[in-house]
């Protein structure tokens, strides 16, 4: 009798353990379901607010274009940071950046071939502001090969399909302009440390074209919004022209025309004649901007970068990407 009672007791304990395990699993699964539901709701809220911030940025840029100013500068309303503000139980913030204050990677190569001014400028940025063990000549040559349509290795330092097909995973060169600066991470000789150091100075934008003839035009950097580091790499990269330009903007306000910029540079360098203006791709206007947005709802943080092109009469979103940097 006692033996049967012992077996029954063990059976009851096993059943209780199984029921307790099932109950715990149900509770855990319910908690996960609640968390998933909350994340979905917060994700939808965050996305809607990021798109609302995009609309805010577009309106700010449109209003700026309506002003009777030729130049774009960091003194204007669009350059002000939108601080974190409460919205529907969350926190949102935003900022507009002038992408034409950066070096456009796609200027290194165009249909006319290698742009020596752009080639020299990017090499200078890599030499001065990235890791000591970086190989600027190899990276810039690899960028030329990444964009150009042929399979000829540039300067015997670049890389074409055969160099990347042996990688794991294997891939090929794009043979087109970059769609994002992050494509630089695919280049031979590039690593994350070098890329992170270079990122504040670069962008990847479409090359401007002539509406009448469809020809590629020269990409211009906005002197009023460019960094001192980038400006110092223009020209032959040996004279501190960039520092002088930044000081002049701080002292007298933004430049209002390309002619004014070139006259200042010519006077600073004390060049009386044969001044090569092509070495100074500078202007005072901007057409490309990045609206950086951030939203926090619950435990979820969502960030989006919106690359926009502003024309004389319209504005359009070229790309949206999630993440901190584009």
What spans do the regions from the language model cover?
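Compositionally biased linear targeting/interaction segments
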Residues: 2-326
